[in-house]
């Protein structure tokens, strides 16, 4: 497998906050985050440039808090801070694995991380550093999926790798419906029309407008990130006509 050439040169990996929590359901599981760091290290070893966007749902969910009566903008800002906590945790895990890493935040906090500067982010990637984008888009009402699409476009990534709990996109929730059918390939419009759980509509539309493919795959199987980068047919690929 190591003799294979990667099919993508620059990727944006989208991780959910829940992925970092592992089976405990909340917070950050050190073993899980170390495992993710090791997978990213392998991909860097193939010569691939890696950027990461992480959600914050393992610490705080803005939409859930807003549904409970909290001001939506304030709740979303709390969610953005949660993503920065996750970003710092992943940075530490990556650097312990020997991978130089930079965190850039959409909300300035210079004592903690660099502010998001597009050209600087690209320069880090060219120097084989992992760049983690924290703080979402920096604006309330936008999800971290939308932040992933936006940053992928800005850094001219070849693909978004969306890591999930299941092994692709299904017609229904496979955990609840045993008749759910898995899709190997989808078009952006199919995702939007059928309301499939890939990314939210804003994020999907951004990818569609800029013809950026999305690969949805299962994170919990070791080696899957590397398999996607090498072009193996796992998960579901979403692209244009």
From Swiss-Prot:
Gene Ontology MF: a single term: UMP kinase activity
One cellular-component annotation, GO: cytosol
GO biological process: 'de novo' CTP biosynthetic process; UDP biosynthetic process
Activity-regulation annotation: Allosterically activated by GTP. Inhibited by UTP.
Associated pathway: Pyrimidine metabolism; CTP biosynthesis via de novo pathway; UDP from UMP (UMPK route): step 1/1
Highest taxon listed in the record's lineage: Bacteria
Catalytic activity, reaction form: UMP + ATP = UDP + ADP
Binding residue positions for ATP: 14-17, 57, 61, 164, 170, 173
Keywords: Allosteric enzyme, ATP-binding, Cytoplasm, Kinase, Nucleotide-binding, Pyrimidine biosynthesis, Transferase
Residues bound to UMP: 56, 76, 137-144
UniProt record similarity statement: Belongs to the UMP kinase family.
Alphabetical list of PANTHER family matching this protein: URIDYLATE KINASE (PTHR42833), URIDYLATE KINASE PUMPKIN, CHLOROPLASTIC (PTHR42833:SF4)
Quaternary structure note: Homohexamer.
UniProt name for this protein: Uridylate kinase
């Amino acid at each position: 497998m190591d003799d294979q050439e990667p099919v993508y040169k620059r990727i944006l990996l989208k991780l959910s906050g829940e992925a970092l929590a592992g089976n405990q359901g909340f917070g950050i599981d050190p073993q899980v985050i170390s495992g993710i760091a090791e997978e990213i290290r392998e991909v860097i070893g193939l010569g691939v440039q890696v950027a990461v966007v992480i959600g914050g749902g393992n610490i705080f969910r803005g939409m859930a808090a807003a549904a409970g009566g909290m001001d939506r903008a304030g709740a979303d800002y709390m969610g953005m801070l949660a993503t920065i906590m996750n970003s710092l945790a992943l940075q530490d895990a990556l650097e312990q694995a020997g991978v130089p890493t930079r965190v850039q935040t959409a909300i300035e906090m210079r004592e903690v991380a660099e502010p998001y500067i597009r050209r600087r982010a690209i320069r880090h990637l060219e120097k084989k550093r992992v760049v983690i984008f924290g703080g979402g888009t920096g604006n309330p009402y936008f999800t971290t999926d939308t932040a992933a699409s936006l940053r992928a476009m800005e850094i001219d990534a070849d693909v978004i790798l969306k890591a999930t709990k299941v092994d692709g996109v299904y017609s229904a929730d496979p955990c609840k419906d045993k008749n759910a059918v898995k899709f190997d390939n989808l078009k952006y419009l199919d995702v939007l029309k059928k309301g499939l759980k890939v990314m939210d509509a804003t994020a999907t539309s951004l990818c569609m407008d800029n013809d950026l493919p999305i690969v949805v795959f299962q994170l919990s199987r070791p080696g899957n990130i590397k398999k996607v980068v090498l072009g193996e047919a796992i998960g579901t690929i979403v692209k244009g006509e």
